[in-house]
Amino acid sequence: AYEQTAGGGQTTATDAEGNVTVYTYDDNYRTTKIEYPDGTFEERSYNTAGYLAGRLDRTGVETTYTYDGKGRVTQEKRQDGATRTYAYNTAGKMTQSTDYDGGKTGYTYDGQNRLTSVTDAEGGQTSYTYDEKNRLVAVKDANGNTTSYTYDGACVTSMTDGAGNTWNYTYDAMNRL
């Protein structure tokens, strides 16, 4: 069950066991605090552009966020000094992320800005293949396993995983699964 205060600044959610989670919002309806039934909480703050500026998680770890001029996150920095960074291409697609431990993940795209590969920090690569209608038709993971998809129009009609298992999907006249 959900209950909202008259001003809209706070909402409570009660689960089937009667546990209450309280959500608090600022004047722009952004979540500023979440209080959980176990007594832990999260807090969030925002910069003047409206982006998430800082977050205190349930374990007490504080993270601050830095953005570029286009509103994309370029850095997450924890209170212990560990950072996670992000780089983007001119089309706005992420090209690299560096995790808190320094591991780098690279992302490549084709001329239509479709993701074609992800290379993880250990060098494992996942590749993505599309058809002429820009539909994802295959994903090959770092272990060489390929999952393939077939379509009827925009609807996936089958998916076959790397072990050869196939799932078939049917839709009604309104394209509902």
Region locations from a protein language model:
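Extended charged/polar low-complexity repeat regions
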Residues: A1-L177
